[in-house]
A protein has these predicted regions:
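Amphipathic hydrophobic-ligand
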Residues: 62-70, 89-98, 124-141, 169-176, ...
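Elongated, acidic membrane-bridging lipid-handling scaffolds
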Residues: 98-186, 196
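N-terminal beta-strand/beta-hairpin edge segment
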Residues: 41-130, 137
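Extended terminal
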Residues: 2-12, 21, 36-37, 166-260
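Residue-level recognition of well-ordered beta-strand positions that form the cores
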Residues: 56-58, 70-72, 87, 137-139, ...
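N-terminal amphipathic/hydrophobic interface segments
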Residues: 14-58
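Transmembrane beta-strands of outer-membrane beta-barrel pores
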Residues: 90, 161-163, 220-222
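Outer-membrane beta-barrel architecture
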Residues: 83, 150-154, 213
Length: 260
């Protein structure tokens, strides 16, 4: 009995020691242990605990400086209930939001706010112009993401004081807003402007993993030749200077054509 009691006490002491180690684990230990699962991302200048810590510098796999990050991880993660608050900051960009993992490939994002200089999107293939200007504000009330696709979405975004540099000239655009709502994996987007800027914009898009379609109408409110020339780069203008764009595609549309 004495030997059994000693063994039980020893196991209890070991469990307690492990619990204390996990409870007060330094964040840098956890980052080192998770290294292979970060897919090349590097966290530097790490301090704090695994439950509440920060990294003074985060680098992507290709060496891009993402910024500094702070996090708070609920201790309920020990029971499999992962709830994480993230805050990221770098010059021109701030991000904060809450993540709740529901399953291996399903997460909920809520209370997400992103503020960024529009120049962050310079170089993207769909951006026409040498440089974007203005401020982007994104608010995601809730987004349930399965894999990489939002199955449910409630969000809005604004592009304030929007303008584009092209061929050494500044193209003034105005202020725009985008509303995004989704359910069952189908996302509806509505685009508009504040009614006072140089460019009137109205648009609608529907996106799903199987198909997409959009309509967009852009019309100058002034006779600015620089703005009209920039619009003409996207397609043929109507006599009133407006531009209408529309398109659709995806697997569902391809299947429909094959059945006809």
């Amino acid at each position: 009995m004495k030997i059994l009691r000693i063994m039980v006490m020893g196991v209890a002491a070991l469990v307690l020691a492990l619990a204390l180690l996990v409870w007060f684990m330094p964040a840098r230990w956890a980052v080192a242990a998770l290294g292979p699962r970060l897919h090349g991302m590097r966290l530097e200048q790490v301090d704090g605990l695994v439950w509440h810590g920060r990294a003074g510098r985060v680098l992507s796999a290709d060496g891009i400086d993402i910024g500094q990050v702070q996090w708070t991880l609920s201790r309920r993660a020990l029971l499999g209930d992962v709830r994480l608050q993230l805050a990221l900051q770098k010059p021109g960009v701030t991000f904060d939001g809450t993540l709740h993992r529901l399953a291996a490939s399903v997460v909920d994002w809520s209370h997400v706010r992103l503020q960024a200089d529009a120049a962050l999107f310079d170089g993207l293939p769909w951006v026409r112009g040498n440089s974007l200007h203005g401020r982007l504000n994104v608010h995601i009330v809730d987004a349930r993401v399965q894999g990489i696709w939002p199955m449910q979405l409630d969000a809005d975004a604004q592009w304030q004081n929007a303008s584009v540099d092209e061929n050494g000239r500044r193209v003034m655009l105005g202020n725009f807003h985008l509303r995004a709502q989704g359910n069952g994996g189908v996302i509806q987007l509505e685009l508009g402007d504040d009614g006072t800027g140089p460019l009137q914009a109205t648009g609608h898009a529907s996106l799903s993993p199987l198909s997409w379609r959009y309509t967009l109408v852009l019309k100058p409110r002034t006779n600015d030749p620089v703005l009209r020339q920039w619009l003409a780069g996207f397609g043929k203008l109507a006599p009133d200077g407006s531009l209408q764009l529309h398109g659709s595609g995806g697997l569902a549309r391809l299947t429909s054509r094959m059945e006809q």
